[in-house]
Amino acid sequence: DILAAFRVTPQPGVPPEEAGAAVAAESSTGTWTTVWTDGLTSLDRYKGRCYHIEXVPGEEDQFIAYVAYPLDLFEEGSVTNMLTSIVGNVFGFKALRALRLEDLRIPPAYVKTFQGPPHGIQVERDKLNKYGRPLLRCTIKPKLGLSAKNYGRAVYECLRGGLDFTKDDENVNSQPFMRWRDRFLFCAEAIFKSQAETGEIKGHYLNATAGTCEEMYKRAIFARELGVPIVMHDYLTGGFTANTSLAHYCRDNGLLLHIHXXMHAVIDRQKNHGMHFRVLAKALRMSGGDHIYAGTVVGKLEGERDITLGFVDLLRDDFVEKDRSRGIYFTQDWVSLPGVLAVASGGIHVXHMPALTEIFGDDSVLQFGGGTLGHPWGNAPGAVANRVALEACVQARNEGRDLAVEGNEIIREASKWSPELAAACEVWKEIRFNFKAVDTL
């Protein structure tokens, strides 16, 4: 069975048992009345069952309802069908004040019907020939308004300075000021020029998201013909069907696939209604993507440490044990499905590098947008500062130093021989985003 954990807030006067049963019925075989065609099938075989209800500590009117769904309710290899069944209709139920899907347990038999990520962590490292450290990346800013040539210039400067990747922002598609084909051409030129000068493999996440699947394929095919290593997709606004199709194309044609989670906070930000990001992360791993955003813990975007590391493990590891302290409601076995690199992004700069290296480990992508392009000396020095800070942190960690305790000292030591890093430390030394996370256990 597929198991689901729902946070249920019933209307006043509705018992939690009734609310849990209603969720199970509405998201499987039930409707609001008895129908004569019920007698033409075996409802016992197909109906969802609410098998356990528990109170939420500190919340008098909220309960966790556990629901089991028989596997035969779901089409094989279709995230679209799975989510349509489980969360498609029930969230508007009048008997509930609010409903949130906290977690899913996907059984190995169903996991095996999915291709998953086009390549996975190890294949990506082999393609890029980069091992033993997180990857570095920058989103080109301003995200909108640059011409294709100026955009390509910024890409070149960042890659030449030492970053592994640069990236289109999520809303860069094909606007009047910069059509997609022009952007692809100038970015490809920047990639190959920086590769020739540095001797390292470089990439730029070319956003293939489009208004139709046919147009999306056209852009992905052009990227492959240019010989670039990676494309990108906005998987929630683009849709799971389009995302799975693009993931299959990327595996067949040797392209890495970066996933942007634009719109996720609309779904997952509210604590008592919607869907937790760990569910979206599991769905993405099944649908297909080699990278996805996972918060930062230390930056400007939402993310509490234990919860964030919980779904980072769900993205990367083959087997994840149930751990309620990290928000993981079920043990998850991914069998042979490849892992996904977690991307840390949002309001981070060189002073955060020790914490990010310690929190996310090697199998991650650290994304410094303003933290690269905001350097007072320009884009390339900003990239140099980030690369020097990362190399210093990785070396210190490998020497057995504690990044959590000695992080500031490690960055200070490195800045003595890197004027670019020293300038970055000076300009961002006062920047803090000290807000409490909304999403807590």
Swiss-Prot record:
Domain of life according to the entry: Eukaryota
Modifications the protein undergoes after translation, according to the UniProt entry: The disulfide bond which can form in the large chain dimeric partners within the hexadecamer appears to be associated with oxidative stress and protein turnover.
EC number: 4.1.1.39
Pfam family, one: RuBisCO_large
Entry keyword set: Calvin cycle, Carbon dioxide fixation, Chloroplast, Disulfide bond, Lyase, Magnesium, Metal-binding, Monooxygenase, Oxidoreductase, Photorespiration, Photosynthesis, Plastid
Essential cofactor(s): Mg(2+)
Residues where N6-carboxylysine is found: K167
Cofactor note: Binds 1 Mg(2+) ion per subunit.
Family: Belongs to the RuBisCO large chain family. Type I subfamily.
NCBIfam families (UniProt xref): PRK04208.1 (NF003252)
Name this polypeptide is given: Ribulose bisphosphate carboxylase large chain
Native source species: Asclepias exaltata (Poke milkweed)
Gene from which the chain derives: rbcL
